[in-house]
Each structure stands twice: as C-alpha cells, then as structure tokens.
C-alpha cells in the first residue's frame, strides 16, 4: 500500500512538473561564423543579427514554446576550421546551423551538415553553393546568378559598351566574376581588362593602373570589404573618373567607414540594406545600432532574417524535425505581413535559393542611399 502511495505521489509530482519542463526546454541553433581573420566584419555582423533575433524570439515565447539556445563558434575565416566546427555542431545536437558567411567555408562545412541531415543557412553568395544538389542548404541572401544580371542591366542603362573588372581570387570573387561576364553578353558589353587580386591584398596600385590603362567605360569591383575599401582609395589616388560599380559589398557600411570620401559615387546592387525605404528594415537598423553601437550592413540583416525564417518555417511544420523542416523550405513563400521578423516577402526554390526585392544603392556624402528598388524575379508570377 505504501509502495502504491509512493508511486502515486511520484507520478503526480512528475505530472505537475511537465508544464515547467516544457517551459525550460530549449532548441539548439549553432552559428559557425567568421569572428576573426579576413571575414571578421562579415561574420560579426551576421552573428550579431542572429543574436538580436534570438533575443526577440525568446522574449516573445521562443519557437513552439521552446527557448532558442544560440551559440556561435569562430571559424577564423578558415574553411577547414569551419568543417571541424560543423562536426562539433552536429555532435552537440544542433537543430539548425547558421553560417558560415564566406563562400569558401560553407562549400566545405556544408558537406558535414548535409551528411547529418541538418538544415544549414549561409550568408555566402557564390552560385556554386546551391548547385551541389544539397537539400539542406539555404541562403540568407540573393545568389550571384540573380544579382549579376541586375548589375549588367544597370551598366547597359549607363550606355557602357566596355568594362574593366577587378575581383578577388577566391570562391566568392571567381564565382561572381564568371557570372557577371555571362550577364554582360546579352547587352553586348565587352570586357577590356580582367584583373585578379588576392584575398587580404594590401597594395592595389597595380590593379588600378591596369584598370585605368584599359580605358573602359566603367569599372566593376567585386572583392571583400577591406579589399574594396583599399581599391576605392587607390582609384581616387590615381584620379580614376569613370563609373565604379559593384555588387553588395562595394557600398556596404564597413567599406564606407574604411574608404572615407573615396567611397563617394560608388554604386552597387544590394540584396539587403539597412538604408532601404522600408519601415520594418529601418526599425531593425535602429534596434541593431542601439544593441551593438554600430550600424549593421547586409550581413547583419542576413543573420537576423535567417533566424526569423527558421522560426516561421518550424512553426509551419509544427515540430522540431530537421528533415521535415528542409522539405518545407523548398518552395515556401513567406510574407512579412504574417511574419514581421523576416522583414521582406521571400520565396525559396528547390535548390535553397531565395528571391525577394533588392536595391540599387549609391554612396552620397559618406552614406549609402537607395536610388532604386528592384522587384523580385517572381513578382507578378
């Protein structure tokens, strides 16, 4: 009888504990981000955006009543370190992995998350990322294949017949350069100088001199942030006076800070910008700056919206099932009206590429200004 009583009391105690247990359960989302090395600017922005989203999500009750437990590991901007950290994230029971941002790193690390069937969001823009048949990889930004035709169209509108190219010789730079050159073909724009530079390169005098000597109608610059700023400073130093056009990085906040007045006049297509004429994005930028004491760039938006996409799709699925989540991501359409945290309406295709509005921007008086809002490719379909 006493045993029965003890069992009954134990059973009642466990039953009463269930609501508390449910409240304290958490779901692990692990970031693999560039917090040091050449990608520190990108990775820190991405990570801070993700952390801000997690703070808000948890304050609002979490995801399906579960608190988000987000931790980030530093890839040191090294692909092999990223790969090792991906294995650790799998061992630690990650539901979703966020990052890396650099294309070269995600190309290596996503092999591990794919093998473990864990959804993986990346800030990388190289087209090759989503061309590997990986059903668990998803972007937080437009692919180069979507962005470069918009840059080529802008050059065509400038009546440019020739162009010089300065690009970084890494997965990001080479991939973008290749797609950009293809995007020029329908417009009949010829490449007069194809100039490769190294990641982390400091001296751009030779590259800029080659671009000047080519005497093309415009210059396309496609490098990472620090290199872009150095290129702009050298261009102004050598008196370059033709249009300077880029994609995403060239007019980013970090480049403007590093290049100073040399950034003025630069034009770039961007998939995301804190300066977009959108109340939701402006509110995000204000919250981010208040939280971290610096202005976010496109990578901050990637981390923030990526985390909210995880929340939205998980809640549609109704459970924490990585495979079901990945299946639901393919072909999903999410509206900012229904899910404000995603900031902009977005769709994902079968490859994990996303589509949404984007922007043409220009640096004016040391600030990025939006000069045009471009529709998503799926608009009107």
Each language-model region and where it sits:
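Sec/Tat signal peptide C-region and signal peptidase I cleavage site
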Residues: 16-22
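Extracytosolic ligand-binding ectodomains
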Residues: 2-7, 11, 22-381
């Amino acid at each position: 009888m006493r045993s029965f009583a003890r069992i009954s009391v134990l059973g009642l105690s466990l039953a009463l504990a269930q609501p508390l247990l449910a409240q304290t359960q958490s779901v692990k989302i692990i970031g693999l981000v560039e917090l040091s090395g050449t990608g520190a600017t990108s990775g820190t922005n991405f990570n801070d955006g993700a952390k801000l989203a997690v703070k808000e999500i948890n304050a609002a009750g979490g995801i399906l009543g579960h608190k988000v437990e987000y931790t980030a590991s530093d890839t040191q901007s090294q692909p092999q370190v990223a790969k090792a950290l991906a294995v650790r994230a799998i061992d630690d029971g990650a539901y979703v992995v966020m990052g890396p941002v650099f294309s070269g790193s995600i190309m290596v690390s996503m092999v591990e998350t794919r093998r473990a069937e864990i959804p993986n969001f990346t800030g990388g823009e190289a087209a090759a990322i989503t061309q590997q048949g990986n059903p668990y990889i998803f972007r937080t930004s437009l692919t180069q294949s979507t962005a470069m035709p918009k840059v080529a169209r802008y050059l065509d509108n400038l009546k440019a017949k020739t162009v010089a190219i300065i690009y970084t010789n890494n997965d990001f730079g080479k991939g973008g350069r290749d797609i950009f050159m293809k995007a020029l073909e329908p417009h009949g724009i010829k490449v007069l100088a194809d100039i490769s530079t190294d990641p982390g390169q400091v001296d751009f005098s030779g590259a800029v001199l080659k671009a000047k000597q080519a005497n093309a109608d415009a210059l396309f610059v496609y490098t990472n942030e620090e290199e872009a700023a150095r290129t702009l400073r050298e261009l102004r130093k050598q008196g370059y006076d033709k249009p300077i056009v880029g994609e995403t990085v060239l007019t980013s906040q970090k480049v403007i800070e590093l290049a100073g007045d040399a950034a003025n006049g630069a034009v770039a297509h961007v998939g995301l910008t804190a300066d977009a004429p959108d109340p939701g994005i402006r509110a995000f930028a204000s919250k981010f700056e208040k939280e971290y004491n610096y202005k976010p760039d496109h990578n901050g938006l990637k981390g923030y919206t990526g985390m909210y996409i995880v929340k939205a799709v998980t809640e549609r699925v109704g459970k924490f099932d990585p495979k079901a989540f990945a299946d639901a991501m393919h072909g999903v359409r999410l509206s900012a009206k229904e899910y404000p945290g995603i900031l902009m309406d977005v769709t994902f295709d079968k490859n994990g590429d996303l589509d949404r509005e984007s922007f043409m921007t220009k640096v004016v008086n040391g600030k990025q200004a939006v000069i045009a809002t471009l529709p998503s490719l799926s608009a009107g379909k």
